[in-house]
Amino acid sequence: MVTMTSVTLGDVRVVRSVDVQSYVGLKPSTARKSVSLLRRTETRPLMVVRASKEGDISVKSSGLSIEESEAAAVAGNFPDPPPPWRPSAPKGTPNVKPLPLTRRPRRNRKSPTLRDAFQETNLSASNLVLPLFIHEGEEDVPIGAMPGCYRLGWRHGLLEEVYKARDVGVNSIVLFPKIPDALKSQAGDEAFNDNGLVPRAIRLLKDKYPDIVIYTDVALDPYSSDGHDGIVREDGVIMNDETVHQLCKQAVSQARAGADVVSPSDMMDGRVSAIRAALDAEGFQEVSIMSYTAKYASSFYGPFREALDSNPRFGDKKTYQMNPANYREALVETEADEVEGADILLVKPAMPYLDVVRLLRDNSALPIAAYQVSGEYSMIKAGGALKMVDEEKVMMESLLCIRRAGADIILTYFARQAASVLCGMKSK
C-alpha cells in the first residue's frame, strides 16, 4: 500500500482523505494510494511517500523506519538521489571521458518517433506509375528476364492487373505494346492506327476506370521492322524530321483514344514542340506531354527489349540516345523541352543516373519523373531470389533514393509491390 501525506512545519488541518486507483500506462496497477489533502497555513508543504509492496513493486530500503523517514523529511534531511541508471557496456570497453561535442546528430536518430518526425523524403502510391506490357492474345505470358512481369492479354489480364494496382492505391499506368511482326513496317504506320492495340486498350480502361491516369509511349521501335525509334534510311541513318511527323500522328491517335499523358521516348530533336502543336490543332490542349528528356543509351534496357521483341535489327541507338558519360548535356535537353512545351521531364534509367535527376530538379520548376528500368528491376529480383539481399528492403530503399534525388514520380515495375508494402499488405 502507498500512503501519501502532506506535512507542514506550522499548523495543518486535514481537509479530506480519499482512496484512488493508481495507473501505469493504461493498465490498473496492484498498488493503491491513500491521499491526505491538507491546507497550507504559513509554510510550504512537503510531500512524503510511504510505500509498501503489494504487487511486484521494488522499493530500495534506506535503513530508516517509516517514522524516521517522515521525521527526516520534515526536517529537510533528504538522502542524495541515486546516480542515473545506465546500461552496462560490454566487457573490455575502455573507460573514456565524453567527447566535448556541442553537436551530436545521433540525438535526432535515437528513436523511431524522432526519426519519423525528421524524415525529409517520403514515398506514397501516388508517386508511382506502373508500366504494363500488353499483347493481342488473351493469355498472360510471363517474361523470362523480368520475374513477376507478364505480357498481359489486352482485355482480361490488363483489367485484372489494373484492378489489383488500384486496390493498393496505384492509379497511374503506362502502356507498352508487343506488336505482331506482321504489323511492323519500316515507317511504323501501325503506331497511329486508331483501332490498334494501344488505342483499344486505352478505351477499354477508360470505360472501366474513368479516373485512371494513362501514360502512353510515343516511339516507333515497337512498330518498326528495324527495331529503331525512328525511320531508318538505307545508309543506316535515323531520319529525324520524318520520324517526328509519324510521332505526331501517333500522339494524336493516343489522345483521341483517351490518353492523359503522351510520352515521347524516341529522343528525336524538336519532337516535343511538334507534338504539342499537333495535339493543340486537334483540340487536345488538356493532354500532357512527359518528355524523355535525358534518355541514355543504356545497357539496363535489355529485359524490356526482350519483353517487346524490340531490339534493333542492326547497330545501336547511340546516334539519338544520350551518352552515359555525359552530364551537362542533360541541361541542353532540359532547356529545349521546357521551351517546346513539355509538362514533365523524365530521366531514364533512374538509379545509375541519380545525379542527373538532381541536376534536372535543381534547374527546372517542372515535375521530374524517373524510370526505374527493367535492368534495375531484374537485378533486385535476382538478388532477392538468390538470398543475396532482402528484396523488399532493397526495393523500398531504391525507390526512396530516387525520390530523395528529386523525382516527383517514378515509373517502376515494383509499383504494385511497393504500394502493397506502403499500405501494410503483402503483395499478391
Show the residue positions of the predicted features:
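N-terminal [4Fe-4S]-dependent radical SAM core
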Residues: 114
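Alpha/beta enzyme core
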Residues: 82-90, 96-99, 111, 120-129, ...
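N-terminal organelle-targeting presequences
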Residues: 34-100, 105, 132
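Low-complexity, intrinsically disordered short peptide segments enriched in small/polar/basic residues
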Residues: 11-12, 17, 21, 32, ...
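Glycine-aromatic-enriched surface loops/turns that form tight recognition elements
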Residues: 106-109, 118
